[in-house]
C-alpha cells in the first residue's frame, strides 16, 4: 500500500555530458578561465592581462608565414647517445618516450616560407621536448637553418624557448654554443638579416650563444631570459635580486634586448624590420 503519493513529478535528469578535455585553460598570470577558441583567436595570449602562453614551432610557423604555408626541412635528424648516459632512465629511452608522448621528434624545427611576399627561414625551439634543451641535433638544425638562409639569401629568425644545454650529451651539447655562433657569422658576412626572438624561457647556453647574437634581439613580453636561474644567483651572491630581474622588460631597460613585441604584432613587425635591414 502506498502511503504517500508524489504530487509533483520529480525533476528529470539527463546524462552528464563531459566537457571535452583541453577545452578550457587557466591563465598563469591572472587566473582567468579561457576557452580554447578564445586562446586561438588571440594567438595564445590572455585577452585579460596579455600573458603569453608557450606555443610550439608549428603555431609560430602558421601565423608568421604568408597564408600559414611552410615547408619543413631536416626533420629527419635524431639524437644519438655518445655518452651512453643514464639518470633515472637511459637517454635513448627518454628521447623515445618523449617522442611518443609529445608527437614531436626534437626540440627544434626548421621551416622555409614567405613573409610579406619575400622568402624567409625560421628555426623555432620547443620547450615541450625535454625542456627545449640544445643537444647535438638542435645545434645541427640551427646551423643548417643558417646555411639555408645563405642558400636562399633570405632573412633568418631564430625563436628561442629553452632551459639551456642538454645535460645528457655533456660536452657535445656545450660544443653547439660555439658551432651555432660560428655558423651565424656567415649571415653577417653576406649582409643577410638575422633576428633573434626570445620567448619564455630563454636560459643557460641558449642565452649565452645565438639568442643574443641577432642583428636585432627582440622578445615577447615578460619572457624569462638569463643564464643561471634567479634562485641560483640569489644563493650564490647572498643578496636579494631587483624586481623583475631576468624578465624581458628589465633586460630591455639595461640594453640587452632591443625591442619587446606582443605576439599579435609580431608578424607585421618582423616584415617591417626585414625591409629596414635590407635597405
From Swiss-Prot:
SUPFAM superfamilies: ClpP/crotonase. Its main location: cytoplasm. GO terms for cellular component: acetyl-CoA carboxylase complex. A zinc finger (C4-type) spans 27-49. Residues 23-279 form the CoA carboxyltransferase N-terminal domain. It is an enzyme of class 2 (transferase). Belongs to the AccD/PCCB family. This is Acetyl-coenzyme A carboxylase carboxyl transferase subunit beta.
